[in-house]
């Protein structure tokens, strides 16, 4: 991971109007039809932003997202229109602000976001495994009996979520509920495109020694109503990546993401008690930051080289 640049916890561009700060990205308006997305080095876990950044994380997430947009969009498999404009982020900020955006930003079309998180699961893991143990289904999708933790599913399943307000948890919903929200045509297209992207990406990643257990996509509509893939795509922040060589059904594989931080937060004590997963977050030790950075870097190195 490139740590030669100082870590960027929060971008401070004054030449463009700030639209929003998400858990990781800061979005700025560029005219009325474009957005500059700056991926900071912030880390969130349990929907709480940590005070300590992960040096190089924003650049890594951007590089990986651009890799996937290239593979899956019009230049590659052409599975779906994408939100990239092709314009250089550096071209819309002042010279003094260039270091804040270089390598960690995307200049994208301003879309109307759809209120559905398009989640695709190819393996049983995390909250899906917990739900399956309880009722034999995941988000209303009935699954065969006898599956174990980390089992590969017979076919990838689509388990959408409703986007929550900032700071809240996304809510798992059924496909039928997405139809009520956005109509049958859009709901069906999002489902079918999401599964197609997941299958294609899984093959590409598997050849590089990475299993994509699950992932989430976001879509929006452009001025012409064209369904467009947006935000980040297939990064360790939006996906569960496992090393293929250590995969074993029945156990939690190590993952190339912030699981290391999550595990540390699960056992850390604050004033003699377990942290209650509300702000402020406990201070993350340098060792945990370094190991988390190494996990992200390993995923990128495997995928891109």
UniProtKB/Swiss-Prot annotation:
Query: What species was this sequence derived from?
Result: Albidiferax ferrireducens (strain ATCC BAA-621 / DSM 15236 / T118)
Question: Pfam families from the entry?
Answer: SAICAR_synt
What GO CC annotations are associated with the protein? cytoplasm
The catalysed reaction is: 5-amino-1-(5-phospho-D-ribosyl)imidazole-4-carboxylate + L-aspartate + ATP = (2S)-2-[5-amino-1-(5-phospho-beta-D-ribosyl)imidazole-4-carboxamido]succinate + ADP + phosphate + 2 H(+)
**UniProt keyword annotations, A-Z:** ATP-binding, Ligase, Nucleotide-binding, Purine biosynthesis
Q: In which pathway does it act?
A: Purine metabolism; IMP biosynthesis via de novo pathway; 5-amino-1-(5-phospho-D-ribosyl)imidazole-4-carboxamide from 5-amino-1-(5-phospho-D-ribosyl)imidazole-4-carboxylate: step 1/2
Q: What is this protein called?
A: Phosphoribosylaminoimidazole-succinocarboxamide synthase
Signal peptide region: none
Similarity-based family: Belongs to the SAICAR synthetase family.
InterPro entries tied to this protein: SAICAR_synt/ADE2_N, SAICAR_synth, SAICAR_synthetase_CS
Intrachain disulfide bonds: none
Q: What GO biological process terms does the UniProt entry carry, in alphabetical order?
A: 'de novo' IMP biosynthetic process
Question: Entry's Gene3D superfamilies?
Answer: ATP-grasp fold, B domain, Phosphorylase Kinase, domain 1
EC number(s) stated in the UniProt entry for this protein: 6.3.2.6
Q: Which GO terms describe its molecular function?
A: ATP binding; phosphoribosylaminoimidazolesuccinocarboxamide synthase activity
């Amino acid at each position: 991971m490139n740590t030669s640049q100082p870590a960027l916890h929060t971008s401070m561009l004054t030449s463009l109007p700030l639209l929003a700060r998400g858990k990781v990205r800061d979005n700025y308006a560029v005219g009325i039809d474009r957005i500059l997305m700056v991926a900071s080095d912030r880390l969130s876990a349990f929907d709480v932003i940590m005070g300590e950044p992960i040096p190089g994380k924003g650049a890594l997430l951007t590089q990986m997202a651009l890799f996937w947009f290239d593979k899956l969009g019009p230049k590659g498999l052409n599975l779906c229109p994408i939100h990239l404009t092709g314009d250089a982020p550096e071209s819309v900020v002042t010279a003094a602000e260039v270091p804040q955006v270089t390598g960690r930003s995307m200049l994208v079309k301003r879309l109307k976001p759809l209120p559905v998180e398009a989640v695709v699961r190819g393996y049983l893991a995390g909250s899906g495994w917990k739900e399956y143990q309880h009722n034999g289904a995941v988000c209303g999708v009935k699954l065969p009996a006898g599956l174990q933790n980390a089992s590969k599913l017979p076919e990838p399943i689509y388990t959408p979520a409703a986007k929550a307000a900032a700071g809240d948890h996304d809510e798992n919903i059924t496909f039928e509920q997405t139809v009520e929200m956005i109509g049958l045509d859009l709901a069906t297209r999002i489902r079918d495109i999401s599964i197609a992207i997941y299958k294609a990406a899984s093959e590409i990643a598997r050849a590089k020694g990475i299993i994509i257990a699950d992932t989430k996509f976001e879509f929006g509509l452009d001025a012409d109503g064209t369904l467009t893939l947006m935000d980040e795509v297939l990064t360790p922040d939006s996906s569960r990546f496992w090393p293929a060589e250590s995969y074993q059904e029945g156990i939690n594989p190590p993952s190339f993401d912030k699981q290391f931080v999550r595990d540390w937060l699960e056992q850390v004590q604050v004033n003699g008690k377990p942290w209650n997963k509300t702000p402020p977050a406990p201070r993350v030790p340098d060792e945990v930051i370094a190991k988390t950075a190494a996990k992200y870097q390993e995923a990128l190195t495997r995928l891109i080289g």
